[in-house]
């Protein structure tokens, strides 16, 4: 039994980046032996084991054979006789097919180091075209390593995948995961478009309002919600197809619904009802969503407008009915609240204008 560090950790280190995680491949072992050493088995498709101390993933060396459609249409062989080179041969790109033994010696049968030096994204073998997920991974790596070039032979393999209709067998969840992993969803879509594979994102048409220009690119929720808001016409349908979490969908919908009206709003003496209507649509009860909404908006350079709305919302939050009003019928209570909100809005606008 021998273990090797493989894949992204080595690639990133050779590129001068700090590896985010480490993955290992185990040669000459079996599920029984791994479990006897305290490893915990996970994964349904093939044996992956979690190290009892580090929590890092260890996968048995394997080969694979195409047996169906999509990224899951493979049969795996994890026999103890599978070699390291055979395992590396099934990987997607040469830069991801480098291993390191316990002595720090690199095993690089497909010249991944040379492609890193020459800034090339190149498939390892003809098996690349059997897995449609690799098109999305290729786009993601091109976004991350923007100064790398996809070699023509690999683009030919992408064309083979597209023409085979294998992309149609990718699940929405897998498409979402690759988009989530990408450093920039706009560039991710752009790379897929260059490859002729952007249909896999299920984006029906591009909107052109250009409202959300400067999301915080270090905040996935802000960045992806802005992308959905900016690029997708039917947000609910798109998020349903890709199984996108509700917090992304909800923030994108709120951006769609309220960002333009806030941007267009100008505080003047008789605009108090417009102010109230805008704030109602924000649904200030959903505090986390509201916080993210204003963070996105502030990042677009609108701090003054954000301060104006947030301070008004704080006043609404602090408003309390008098004890005598609480005893009134519901329809009367509603009228009291609406009247009080109008007074608060008028006073807030007046205070703002006095300070200008």
Predicted feature residues:
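Catalytic cores of the polymerase beta-like nucleotidyltransferase superfamily
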Residues: 1-356
């Amino acid at each position: 039994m021998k273990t090797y560090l493989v894949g992204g950790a080595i690639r990133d280190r050779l590129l001068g980046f700090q590896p985010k995680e480490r993955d290992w491949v185990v040669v000459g072992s079996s599920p029984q032996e791994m479990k006897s050493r305290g490893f915990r088995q996970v994964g349904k498709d093939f044996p992956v084991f979690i190290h009892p101390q580090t929590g890092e993933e260890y996968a048995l060396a394997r080969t694979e054979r195409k047996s169906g459609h999509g990224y899951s249409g493979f049969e795996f062989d994890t026999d103890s006789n599978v070699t390291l080179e055979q395992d590396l041969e099934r990987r997607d790109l040469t830069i991801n097919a480098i291993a390191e033994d316990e002595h720090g010696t690199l095993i690089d049968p497909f010249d991944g180091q040379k492609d890193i030096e020459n800034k090339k994204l190149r498939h390892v073998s003809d098996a690349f075209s059997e897995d449609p997920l690799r098109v999305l991974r290729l786009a993601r790596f091109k976004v991350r390593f923007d100064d790398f070039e996809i070699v023509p032979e690999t683009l030919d393999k992408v064309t083979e995948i597209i023409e085979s209709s294998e992309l149609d067998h990718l699940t929405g969840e897998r498409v979402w995961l690759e988009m989530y992993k990408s450093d920039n969803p706009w560039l991710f879509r752009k790379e897929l478009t260059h490859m002729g594979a952007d249909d896999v994102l299920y984006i029906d048409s591009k909107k052109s309002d250009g409202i959300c220009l400067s999301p915080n690119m270090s905040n996935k929720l802000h960045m992806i919600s802005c992308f959905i808001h900016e690029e997708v016409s039917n947000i609910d349908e798109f998020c349903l197809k890709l199984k996108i979490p509700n917090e992304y969908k909800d923030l994108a919908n709120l951006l769609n619904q309220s960002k333009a009206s806030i941007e267009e709003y100008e505080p003047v003496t008789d605009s108090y009802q417009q102010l109230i209507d805008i704030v109602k649509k924000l649904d200030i009860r959903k505090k986390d969503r509201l916080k993210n909404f204003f963070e996105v908006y502030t990042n677009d350079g609108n701090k003054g407008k954000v301060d104006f709305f947030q301070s008004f919302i704080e006043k609404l939050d602090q408003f309390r009915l008098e004890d005598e009003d609480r005893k009134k019928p519901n329809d009367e209570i509603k009228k009291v609240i609406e009247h009080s909100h109008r007074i608060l809005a008028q006073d807030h606008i007046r205070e703002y204008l006095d300070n200008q």
